[in-house]
Amino acid sequence: MLRISSSSSMALKFSQILFIVLWLSLFFLLLHHLYSLNFRRLYSLNAVEPSLLKQHYRSYRLVSRKVLSDRFDFTPFHSRDNSRHNHRSGEQYDGDEIDPRYGVEKRRVPSGPNPLHH
């Protein structure tokens, strides 16, 4: 008969226990995740009998940004932005504008992509 020493059998038992505990924790985590997904789906599709849980879920449901923006009137903000910007064309600029802060002639700054960056 083959005898296994007590230290090796104890190590074998510890590894088996650790293996079982890890697999059980993974199984319960997966079970919890699937249960919560199915639970939400059942209560969101159930329109026959509203329950307290369904009302609670409905009150905390997230609303998309598009729906919020459809309900809100942004015209005051748009008109203020348009009145603040003073767009000039190239023909209107005569080059004689004096900067009130420094008392010198204002220079035009070219806009567009930075030529130093590729």
Curated annotation (Swiss-Prot):
Keyword annotations from UniProtKB, A to Z: Developmental protein, Differentiation, Glycoprotein, Hydroxylation, Secreted, Signal
| Protein's UniProt keywords contain Electron transport | no
Q: Where is this region: Disordered?
A: 75-118
Q: Which domain of life is it from?
A: Eukaryota
Q: Name one GO cellular component term.
A: apoplast
Q: Which family does it belong to?
A: Belongs to the CLV3/ESR signal peptide family.
Q: What is this protein called?
A: CLAVATA3/ESR (CLE)-related protein 12
Q: Which organism is it from?
A: Arabidopsis thaliana
Q: Which gene encodes it?
A: CLE12
